[in-house]
Amino acid sequence: MHLQNTHNTMESNAAMDAASPASRDVRQFHDLITCRLCRGYMIDPTTVDYCYHTYCRSCILKHLLRAVYCPECKASGGKEINELNLKSDDTLRSLIYKLVPGLYQRECKELADFKEQHDLVDEQTTDEPEFFTTTELISLSLEYHPAMLHQCGPGEVPPTIYLQCAAGLPVELLKRFLCSKYNIETDNGLVEVEVTYKDEVLPTNFTLMDVAYCYNWSRESPMAFCYRILLYDNEQTKNDENNLSRINQDIEPEHSVRRSKSAKSVTFAEDLESEIDSGSPRSKVRCKTPPKVSPSSKNKRLTSSKREAEPESPVSNFKSLRSNDMRYSDYAVSKVKSEPEQEQFLLPREREQQPLEANTNIVVSIPPSQLRKSYVDAEDFELKTANRKGVGHLPKLKIELNSMKSKLSMPLSAGPRLEDTSCSLSCSAQQLDLETYAKNIGLKPIEQPLQQSASNPDSKYSPNASPMSSCSSSTNGSSSSLGTADASTSTSTSSSHRKRKKKHSKEPKDANGKRKKLHAEISSQTDGKMKVKITAKPNHKLDFKRSHSLASGELDLQKLKLDSTSTSEALNRTLGEEARSINSLVVGGAPTPPPTPTAEPEQQQQQQQQQQQPQQQQQQQQQQQQQQQFVVLPKIKDLTLPTSPPLPPSLFKAYTPSTTPTAPHTVAGGKPKQQQQQMPQQPQAVLQQSLAKTNPAKPPLSSNNNRKPNSGHFAVPQAPTHRNMYHMQRYQSTPSSIASAANKMPKRSMSLDESHPAKQARLSQAQAMASSYAAKLHMQTSNQAKSQAAAFLPNPQMRSYGLPDLGSKPTLPMLCPASSSSQVTITPRPRATPSIYSFSEPNIHVPALEIVRLPVNKQSAGGKGLTMPPLSPPATSSARLMGPPAALPKHAGHGHGAAKRSCQMPTMPMPLPLPLPMPMTTIPAIVKSPPLSVALSGQRNNKGNSSNSNAYRTSPPALINLRNTAAPQHSFPSKSSPKVEANSKKSPPAAGCQGKTNGTAALDKSKTSLREFRPAVQSAVTATATTSVTTAAGAGAGAGTGTGTALAKDADILDLSANPGRSNNDAKLAPNSPPAGNNNNNNNNNNNNNNNNNNNNNNSTSNSLEAALNKIKQNISANSNGGPSTTSGSNSNGTTNGDDLQNLHMLSESATAREKISIKAASSGNGSGSTSSSSAKPKNANALVRPQNASVRSIPNPSALAFRNQPAAASTAASISKPLTVRAEEKPKVSTSNPGSLSPTNTSSSSSSSSSGSSGCSAATSPRAMTKKPTTIDQVAANLNIRAEAKAAALAEEAPPVLSSNAAKSPELAKTTTAVALRPEPKETPITVSAASTLLTIPSAVSSVSAVPETMAKPPVQIANAPVASSA
């Protein structure tokens, strides 16, 4: 049936197309619609479901009374059938009734007669007839198309015509009727009348009955037909359109053609309006004189046709085609109105020549303004007949746009483009098109276009004047400030050298918000590769000679340097352009380094510098533009990048594609910038001051900071936003931005993409942190409030982008030289960076204790320079460890942003021992993690100090609570630890409950909430610490926690890094070995998993942070979590454990970092400590690490995931803080539950947060998590970001440097924790990371907290609560 129907329809259409509406005889379908039993038309066709043969229902039923086989299948042995096998075919029934005129009515009449005869008149359904007869009268109305009415004057609107016609009336007769009404000769080829229904042009062979069937006319109201009169320049246009419509009739019988016509008229409604102003379309139509009618409709058509005709040449103009620019869209408006008819007539002729394309696409291609003119009243005027909008019409649209160019007054910017186009069009339209297209794309240098550009060099290359600029104007518009002089020079160069095409590399706006124009000359002469030459003011002739290599670019740079006398802006622009072109080459994979060898040695160095400097220069240009633009050139001249040269190839390859360009900036770019900045510093004291603030050691960031701190750019409130903006700008400004890779990456906050560069950046961050402390001292002396705020804000921002240098820049000169040179040095610096935190002062108070504790821990003394307030650096790491997870949601990217924010937030928490509760409240989200980290670091440093556990307890519970799900696993009983792990994975509430069960002895209080847990915290601290140690041992990932083995409290904190599975095993073992205050005992219990971890923990309670920082730096440099990364050998084990936590943090910070760290942690065991945990739970750890790496890779934004997990982690940290208070007696229980919870903290689930603390802590954490409801990642990120920014602003002034150290540490933590966290769920890893990083940070905090009474543990807990709320 369906096949038959389709066939019929197709045949009918074909017949209609071929001839008149009645061209198809019903007899052609007889075989399809007649019954084989009665040989008549099938009435109520019924199909046999077996063979699909169709018969009249009455016929087949009668047949079944005699036989049980299908009449057509019986001979072939068909199946037996019965009434159940019969299916009514309503579709075929409808087709038959529609095909056979009068059949339906005859059957209805017969049925009625039959019923009357047999008295079967049951509720006769007097439904309206479903089918029409050719003689049935249909009411209809003819109305002038509303889209054309605007052209008519108030008294010229034609009246609506109402008719009643037979259903068989063809549309052709309606058209003839209209022609007679308006005295239009039907054979007049210049005038056409179109009849539309529902904005679809009807084919002339359609009948009213066809319209009723096709549009489901319901007989409720007259058919509302619309008509319009179209005027053509010549008959050819009409014929072409008619032919097109006929061609399209096969698909949609004339709908497409008339749509095209309507589209034309509609498109040119404005033109018609101008004509109609002279006379209404009807008056024209009414006038027998076709010209009068034609003026209105023809003008419309002519406009469209003219547009079409001219567009052919313009079609070559790629820009006009691509852009819906008003310049192109309104090209013909003014002239059309002034000379509507003439132009329109011309256009119609051209259009007639190209009627098909023009008809279809005019509506679409013409800008809305033009469409309004044509169909002001009805956008729907674009008839539903989309057929006319054919792909073929698109070119005509383009042509129309170009044609319009000549007519319309173009903006100045558009003018040059049009002029170029006109010149090229006059020469060769297609060449111009191709050339323009190539120019726009920037693929090939076009000699002729270059000539044209030479003729109009300035206008063409003015930001908006050139066709190329139109394409790149959006990107280049901001760079216009840089490139006015460059534009002219490059223009002249391009004109002189046709082979070279000057390309404005697209760059994001600079910090100042202006886009720099980089003129890259593409050398077509290059043998196999296109080389981009940065055009500066240097002679392009020389460059042209050297166009094959970048040597010309180098010479240009040298010339620019020599030409320092030229405007500083011009120099900066040139440098920026060169850097960008080099970056683009790097991004594109073009052999930028190869050209370097061709250049002279100095040139090579300069090229390397330039390559490294592209970022540096971009930053410096921005910075120095603010400071002194000429400084950049001296830097470039004198600048030698001894350390950076090794970086450029790898960095550029890795850097250019990755969004981690900040890392290259920091590492490769940073050193060159340092040198450059140092060079300027000597000549300029002012620059030295600003650069000193920015820390030359971290030039890339410092350069950005130089801009910002020097100008006071980073207001505390602004810091997060501007940081992001600057990083984004940098990336955008780099060629990668052209590729849009960098642009995309910033969305992630660079965290994920920083895999290698990020680590390097983090190294820089560690350096920056160290330097930031010195810088903070520096800045305090110079501009404490302002520079601190600037340094602080930049640091978080830099970190978020993997550029910690900004924040720590100020101190980098003092501390960073060694830091940048050696990671170990950096670690002590970050240690000293406590002032970096906004809460550095409280840290300073605690630091004395912390310093003492760190020395107590040989690792801490050796690992990190306690010379600087050690507490702050641990706080920094703690803030970073804790903070980054909290901050991660906002900085989906690398943990640097998170670290920065965490630093910002933790900045407050760092003083947490005393003032932290308030700061935490202020910065709840990020502050959570810092307190936990601070407390953890302090506890690690002072394994035996309850104050450390208090400090830990102060902050970590909040973070732990964030990932409360893991909290239950902290429960002390080893029996419940497995359940705790499971629960921690399940949900914070469950975790909390299990935590209660596990920590029944001393942590039952924590069941209810953190508050309940607080009273037990002191007593539980010992147990928690022991448990932590056990957990760390059991987890093997709880390096930081395990580090506190000497004290159970420290162990608890370290446990956060332990994997849940490990934690359970370790927890079981740990309970066996009493807290004993010995990590070794716990290790003995968990010797397989935790022996190394415990040793590591013992070594690195305080050193864990130091080692973490060292490792972070080493990992950044070596991209490995190996113990050697830790600064101190003794710290290596404990540090690795702490590093595991840090690595977890790193995991949350960046997917790339996670992958590398996890792989390294799995392979190398995260150094001695990580190896212990990895080897302790080796196979699980490694296996989990690899899956996590895979998952991290699969996760687009691991940082975001980390943040999603972060809230729970923060809450977990809070709960952990309390567990720190758990007494040693409870150690076995705590360790039992902690291992499980630690594992979750690492990655399994919220239980990881519990792992940092004792089970009581987990209980507290779970209550917080339950109370708090894990928020969505977006919510947490938003809250954390807002609070972090607010707090960062406040805290930045106090201790921005600490943030740097935290940032430095946190990457390590992330890395170390990565190995641990990798083992559990990848999604959990981010959570674990936050908790672990919080714990790691805590050692520093603990150092500061150590002096703080246990009562301080409660305030930190409160702070943790505030952070939890903020995360929620």
From Swiss-Prot:
Subcellular location field: Nucleus
Pfam family name, one: zf-C3HC4
Composition skew (Low complexity), residue ranges: 462-495, 599-628, 672-689, 1078-1099, 1119-1138, 1161-1183, 1231-1263
GO annotations of cellular component type: nucleus; PRC1 complex
Main location: nucleus
Keyword Iron-sulfur listed: no
GO biological process assignments: heterochromatin formation; negative regulation of transcription by RNA polymerase II
Entries under InterPro entries matching the protein: RAWUL, Znf_C3HC4_RING-type, Znf_RING, Znf_RING/FYVE/PHD, Znf_RING_CS
Keyword Ion transport tagged: no
Compositional bias ranges of the Basic residues kind: 496-506
UniProt cross-references to Gene3D superfamilies, sorted A to Z: Phosphatidylinositol 3-kinase Catalytic Subunit, Chain A, domain 1, Zinc/RING finger domain, C3HC4 (zinc finger)
This protein's UniProt keywords: Developmental protein, DNA-binding, Metal-binding, Nucleus, Zinc, Zinc-finger
Start and end residues, zinc fingers (RING-type): 35-74
GO terms assigned for molecular function: DNA binding; promoter-specific chromatin binding; zinc ion binding
SUPFAM superfamilies xrefs: RING/U-box (SSF57850)
Listed Polar residues bias regions: 449-461, 936-953, 962-977
Role this protein plays: Regulates expression of the homeotic selector genes by influencing higher-order chromatin structure through interaction with other proteins.
Name of protein: Protein suppressor 2 of zeste
Organism: Drosophila melanogaster
Classification of source organism: Eukaryota, Metazoa, Ecdysozoa, Arthropoda, Hexapoda
UniProt gene name: Su(z)2
